[in-house]
Amino acid sequence: MAEATYTPKLRTFYDEVVRPKMIEQFGYKNPMEVPTIDKIVINMGVGEATADTKKVTTAAADLAQIAGQKPVITRARKAISNFKLRENQPVGAKVTLRKARMYEFMDRLVSIALPRVRDFRGLNPKSFDGRGNYAMGVKEHIVFPEINYDRVEQIWGMDIIVCTTAKTDEEARALLKAFNFPFRQ
C-alpha cells in the first residue's frame, strides 16, 4: 500500500493555475521552461551581537520558529575595529527553505505576515536583482503568527530573498504576482 504524500496548497496552485497562466502569457513551448520558485532565504542580522552573543541565540530561536527548521549561525568574515567586531564572531542567523517548507512559508508570508505589517502599502516592485530574484525586508519579526508577542525580548528585522528560475525580472514579477504577492502600483 502506497503512503499518501503531502503536497502544500501553493504547490498544487502552481501546477493547476500559475503554470498554465505563465505558458499562455509568455508562450513557453515546454512546460519545464516555466519559471518556478527555487528557494527562499531568510537572513537575520543581529547588530547588537558584538556586545552580547546571547542575542544571536535568541534571534536564531525565533527564526527557527518562523521557518520551521534550524537556522545556521552566520559569523563575521573579518575583523572591523570600528564596529567592535572580531573575526569569526557570531553576527546573525539564516535559513534556506526549499520544497514543501518553502511553499508553506510563502503562504504564511503572503496571507498572514505581510497584511500585519504596520503602514504596509505593498511590496516595492523595483527590488528585483536583474536575474529574476526578489529581495525584501521585514522590520519586525513579530508579524509572523508563530511568534508569541508576550515572550519576545527584542524585535528583530529580517531579509527575505525569493530565488526563482526566471531569466528576467519581468518573468519573476509575473510569477510572484500569480502567487498573490502584493506589489505596489
From Swiss-Prot:
Family, per entry: Belongs to the universal ribosomal protein uL5 family.
Keyword vocabulary terms for this entry: Ribonucleoprotein, Ribosomal protein, RNA-binding, rRNA-binding, tRNA-binding
GO biological process: translation
Job of this protein: This is one of the proteins that bind and probably mediate the attachment of the 5S RNA into the large ribosomal subunit, where it forms part of the central protuberance. In the 70S ribosome it contacts protein S13 of the 30S subunit (bridge B1b), connecting the 2 subunits; this bridge is implicated in subunit movement. Contacts the P site tRNA; the 5S rRNA and some of its associated proteins might help stabilize positioning of ribosome-bound tRNAs.
Pfam family, one: Ribosomal_L5
GO molecular function: rRNA binding; structural constituent of ribosome; tRNA binding
Species this chain originates from: Xanthobacter autotrophicus (strain ATCC BAA-1158 / Py2)
Protein name: Large ribosomal subunit protein uL5
Superkingdom as given in the UniProt entry: Bacteria
GO cellular component terms attached to this protein's record: ribonucleoprotein complex; ribosome
